[in-house]
Curated annotation (Swiss-Prot):
Name by which UniProt lists this protein: DNA-binding protein Fis
Disordered: annotated span: 1-24
Natural source organism: Mannheimia succiniciproducens (strain KCTC 0769BP / MBEL55E)
Molecular function via GO: DNA-binding transcription factor activity; sequence-specific DNA binding
Protein family per UniProt: Belongs to the transcriptional regulatory Fis family.
Function per UniProt: Activates ribosomal RNA transcription. Plays a direct role in upstream activation of rRNA promoters.
Residues annotated to bind DNA: 75-94
Entry keyword set: Activator, DNA-binding, Transcription, Transcription regulation
SUPFAM superfamilies hit by this protein: Homeodomain-like (SSF46689)
Subunit and partners: Homodimer.
Any single Pfam family the record assigns to this protein: HTH_8
């Protein structure tokens, strides 16, 4: 039996209510893009120095929280699922006060 290959981004969706009041799924990247569009429009021409870190923290913290719940705190399994070294995971957990 052949397994169907899915792009990891296919599964990262956000449920939204469309103009016909129907719930649909859209890629997470679309929500991130909209959030950035909103943020940049509020800057009113001002520069910002830490946008990358700001966006990364907004995504990374809840991702780490959810993966640690999913793995029931198993850091080795969580690191494997994230595709990072366990030491790197421990640093990130410490950064967000999660470990």
């Amino acid at each position: 039996m052949l397994e169907q290959q899915r792009s990891p981004s296919d599964a990262l969706t956000v449920s939204v209510l469309n103009s016909q009041s129907q719930v649909t799924n859209k890629p997470l990247r679309d929500s991130v893009k909209q959030a950035l569009r909103n943020y940049l429009s509020q800057l009113d021409g001002q520069d910002v120095n830490d946008l990358y870190e700001l966006v990364l923290a907004e995504v990374e913290h809840p991702m780490l929280d959810m993966i640690m719940q999913y793995t029931r705190g198993n850091q080795t399994r969580a690191a494997t699922m994230l595709g990072i070294n366990r030491g790197t995971l421990r640093k990130k957990l410490k950064k967000y006060g999660m470990g």
